[in-house]
Amino acid sequence: MHIAVVGLSHRTAPVEIRERLSIPEQTMETSLQSLRGHEQVLEASILSTCNRLEIYTLVRHPDLGVSAVSEFLSGHSGLATGELTPHLFNYHHEDAVDHLMRVAAGLDSLVLGEGQILSQVKKMMRLGQEHKSLGPILNRLLTQAVSTGKRVRSETNLGTGAVSISSAAVELAQLKLGQSRGLDQLVTLESEQIAVVGAGRMSRLLLQHLQAKGASGVVLLNRTVQRAELLAADFPDLPVQCRPLTDLDQCLSTCSLVFTSTAADDPIIDAARLEPLNRRSKLRLIDIGVPRNIAADAAAVDGVESHDVDDLQEVVARNQEARQAMAREAEQLLQQEAQQFLEWWDSLEAVPTINRLRSSMETIRVEELQKALSRMGPDFSARERKVVEALSKGIINKILHTPVTSLRAPQGRQERQQALRTVERLFSLGDD
């Protein structure tokens, strides 16, 4: 058995490719079932975010398993394998474990050290458990990854400061506004008329950062106004006007800055929608949805400046050096967590031998116990029989404790295999 991950991210694929591979939660069960239906895939889990799509698997054969996942991604996206492959990465075993630890810690994120990715890894594990696509190996790996992410944020400086895709989007708006005034710096958003489209987790983070950066008010649009109102209620100090999505055209006519973050499968803003507005002032659109909420042709409309998640690199580069120094603090911790999982994985090699050893000892125990009890005669009470049986079990457990602990202990693969062969020879443990 082998652990493998196949995926793509902001590092390997542009947003127009990533959006075609995005797997929303409502189709996650079907996708996991499809993967598990392949004879090569024993366990599977999917991480799908705006910046990455990664599929973690336990497979029978690494190359055949990776091919199975690649074929699934090709079918899901509608992209030919030859078109998709240049954007994919794959890692096996130790490299796959190391990669997941880095992802959970935020070290592989566009915004280095971002906190939201840990919640997304937790969600990946929860969905895998709910849809029964996880087994003991990936369940243990994901549990270790979540532990790693928590430790990095609590034990290193990388956990300081709120960083996320949403915070970078707000900073991008500040930067572009400053540049329009001839300034290479972030400026306040106090005078901007701002709209946020969508009322999910990303929109919540947008409202938090807009409030922190001086926004004087926000129009919050959503298909369901009630959901927008529930979100707005959590921001009593920020004037939020909740409106239905049918008011989007009006907001595009009056607002100067619009953020989009919806789960729509297709763009909700495009050139055809913007051109009739005949705006006289600049409209800045910032889209952090994947799939994209704003069509690529929107940027061609006069007076419109459109950005997507790939444009956040400009903001990220401004403070990346400082966060890189913080990230180095986390490297040793990541190595410890990865090694802990790999030692557990290696110890599984001893399980069949340990089980055969226990079975052999249990057979001997039962046979000898029956001989002893038959000699005791009918006067031997049921209580006394239980005491003797407990005694026999205790003796066996004491005898087995040291060899079993030794077989499970961290050690090199060659040393473990030699120890297994020694135990099997000494106790005559055959595969039968």
Curated annotation (Swiss-Prot):
Record site feature (Important for activity), residues: 99
The EC number(s) this enzyme carries: 1.2.1.70
Amino-acid positions noted as binding NADP(+) in the UniProt annotation, renumbered to this chain: 198-203
Active site, per annotation: 50 (nucleophile)
CDD domains documented for this protein: NAD_bind_Glutamyl_tRNA_reduct
PROSITE patterns referenced in this protein's UniProt entry, alphabetically: GLUTR (PS00747)
Residues annotated as binding substrate: 49-52, 109, 114-116, 120
Alphabetical list of Pfam families matching this protein: GlutR_dimer, GlutR_N, Shikimate_DH
Protein name as it appears in the record: Glutamyl-tRNA reductase
Originating organism: Parasynechococcus marenigrum (strain WH8102)
Lineage: Bacteria, Bacillati, Cyanobacteriota, Cyanophyceae, Synechococcales
GN (gene name): hemA
